[in-house]
Amino acid sequence: YLSELAGGKKKKESIFDAFKVFKDFKNYLGNAYLHFSEPIDLDTFLTNNVNENYSIDSPQEKPEWLESATGMLGDEVIRSINNSVAVTSTSLFSIALLTSTTQTMSEDDLIERINFFLTLIKDSSDYGQVWVTQTDIKGIISKTEKLGFISPTLIGSNKVYRPSSDEVATLSFYKNNISHLFILYSLICESVKFIRQVPKDEIIRLIEMIYPIFAKDFHLKTEKISQREIENAMQTLIQKGILNDEQENFIKAPEEDNFYYSNYIALSNLCEPSLKRFYIVMNAMWKSEAISKDDLKLKCKELAEHLEQIEGWPYPEFSDQAKFDNFVYAMKKTKYFKEDDLGNLSASIITKRAKNLYEQFFDKDFLDFIENQAN
């Protein structure tokens, strides 16, 4: 798993893999948390998504609706799991550390950052009731160390946390478990990162447009988002000093010397890799009238490999066939892509019209790089 997360090739599993973990039982294993989400009534689900007369008369029968209904049910299960996630110590530690631009933090800075993420959960209208398994911040850090996920370095009398590449891959698994709790905040922060100030209504329009693909990607509660939900999230960020609304009906990022600037950047960093992946794909689509899925994957993979050399972080979605297939499926479901009878893909008209809005998420260097590599 760690190899795949770092961009390596997918490895086959073996029956003998289970025996390799026996040595871990002598170590501290922490806690396992079991949390139940809302039950899904299958009869109601099929009635609503197929029709009242759905039926399968034998195990060999595969009606036309079965594949799509199974996919929708899978999405519903994952959404339910995410909505009832247990926020563990390791997840909080991981998201606090890995959203730092340098992925290096002192203990004091880490304590402040974990507390910031805890308050965002508490104030969230969607996820305020999720189970946070531990709120003592020093205990959160101590437990992550005890589990062996990271060892601090002492610089003078201060603890500094600087994970190795293997530790980053491990911690990323735990970070990803709770990233969805903060993705709306992250998108709002990213929308004002490269522009001096932005009208509130433009931010709302941009988030409404991009939200469906993130809802699919992160299995969020709903596939679409309302203006009120965006405004509430925006207001939460303003109250915490993460955004500035000094000028009426305009939003801007805090100044670099502002106390809250590092928290603002941490939130922005959370959605940035997914946004870049989205733009890499969309840029390839905009430059093609129609393109096969294999050709699209090849173009994106080549471009991402060049980007990896600059950024130092992989884009495994373009090297893993299953991940890429899932991504294309999500883009079709959210109507960003159209597919013709030959299986070729094309960008929907609305995405072409919104290209300038999407570019608001990125700095000029990234946009120039994508444009030059694509030509």
Enumerate the predicted regions with their spans.
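Membrane-interfacial terminal anchoring regions of lipid-handling membrane enzymes
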Residues: 1-375
